[in-house]
UniProtKB/Swiss-Prot annotation:
GO cellular component: cytosol
Name of the protein: Alanine racemase
Organism listed in the record: Campylobacter jejuni (strain RM1221)
EC number of the protein: 5.1.1.1
Cofactor(s) essential for the protein: pyridoxal 5'-phosphate
Residues annotated as the enzyme's active site: 33 (proton acceptor), 237 (proton acceptor)
Protein task: Catalyzes the interconversion of L-alanine and D-alanine. May also act on other amino acids.
Gene name, Swiss-Prot/TrEMBL: alr
Length: 328
């Protein structure tokens, strides 16, 4: 069966490197949404906890429940209020019109729209939002924003930072001891993080976004069959690849049903061991030169992202959660 190997030492190295950058593990919010970006949330949770991480963020209540035994604080980022929220968790308030729909006395972090215009409350509407939060009997314990262009060299990043500083000044008039967080993975290595803020880290904890970090995930497939492909014979759907000489080929147990982008046989898609995929990828398998019982499909998602003209996030989060993940 196909297999995802998670490098424990690389993950721990990355978290230590990040914690050193921001000052401590206590100021770190590890984002574990979407199965920890495809890496396996439940597999990584005890590693993060043992290093001193006590705060994580996830997408949904279901994700929070999966790892609640490991962390003191779990922020749910994409929640639609239903009135029966769990007091064990913290909920993002993304739209002030939804405030009355939350269960009373539930802990919330208020999302501020500082310029991304996706979720959150505009700074000019913040005082009105505070009134609604107080009248709804919600427990405001934090406030945050998300930078839209922290990885791009334009001025919008600094405009958003300034807008968040304005929001902090306003909310501090009404509340004390709030937890603030604005810097994401892209912003982490772009400048100093304000001393009164935590830092949310997503993909950087898995080795992307800074050259000093180490890749954590590698994807492997196992051989289903092998044969001699004779000169002039083709392999796979449509016969896209034809052997120019006799060659030993093998078929491996990984395909687009496992969350991989479908290779259509055009161009050279280089695998983790340097071999290239031969012919079109099938639903549950692909072929290449025989590389033994096990083959590394990729250990750097950037290579596949570049080939398919997408981003490394998409390569990783699409990996089927049913693929076994193991620590190595």
């Amino acid at each position: 069966m196909s297999l995802i190997k998670i490098d424990q030492k690389a993950y721990e190295y990355n978290l230590r490197h990040i914690a050193k950058k921001i000052g401590s593990f206590q100021r770190l919010i590890c984002v574990f949404k979407d199965n920890a970006y495809g890496h396996g949330a439940k597999l990584l949770a005890p590693l993060a906890k043992n290093l001193g991480v006590s705060f994580v963020a996830v997408k949904s209540e279901e994700e929070a429940q999966e790892i609640e035994e490991f962390f003191e604080n779990i922020l749910i980022l994409s929640h639609r209020p239903h009135g029966n929220e769990n007091s064990r968790f913290i909920y993002a308030l993304n739209d002030i019109s939804q405030a009355k729909k939350y269960k009373q006395d539930i802990k919330i972090h208020l999302k501020i729209d500082t310029g991304m215009h996706r979720n959150g409350i505009c700074v000019e509407n913040l005082e009105h939002a505070i009134d609604l939060i107080q009248s709804s009997d919600l427990k405001l314990t934090g406030m945050f924003t998300h930078f839209a262009s922290a990885d791009e060299m334009d001025g919008s990043f600094f405009v958003q930072k300034e807008n968040f500083q304005k929001a902090k000044k306003i909310v501090k008039k009404y509340f004390s001891n709030l937890l603030f967080h604005s810097h994401n993975s892209a912003a982490l290595f772009r400048g100093k993080i304000p001393e009164d803020e935590y830092c949310r880290v997503g993909l950087v904890q898995f080795g992307y976004g800074d050259s000093n970090l180490k890749r954590v995930l590698s994807l492997y497939a196992h051989r289903l069959s092998q044969r001699i492909l004779q000169k002039g014979q083709s392999i796979g759907y449509g016969g896209i690849f034809t052997a120019a000489k006799d060659m030993e080929v093998a078929t491996y147990d990984l395909g687009y049903a496992d969350g991989l982008f479908r290779y259509n046989g055009k161009g050279e898609l280089v695998l983790g061991n340097g071999k290239v995929m031969l012919g079109k990828m099938s639903m549950d398998s692909f072929s290449c030169e025989n590389s033994g019982e096990e083959i590394c499909v990729f250990k750097d998602a950037d290579i596949w992202a570049d080939f398919f003209h997408t981003i490394n996030y998409e390569i990783l989060v699409k990996l089927n959660p049913n693929i076994q993940r193991v620590l190595v």
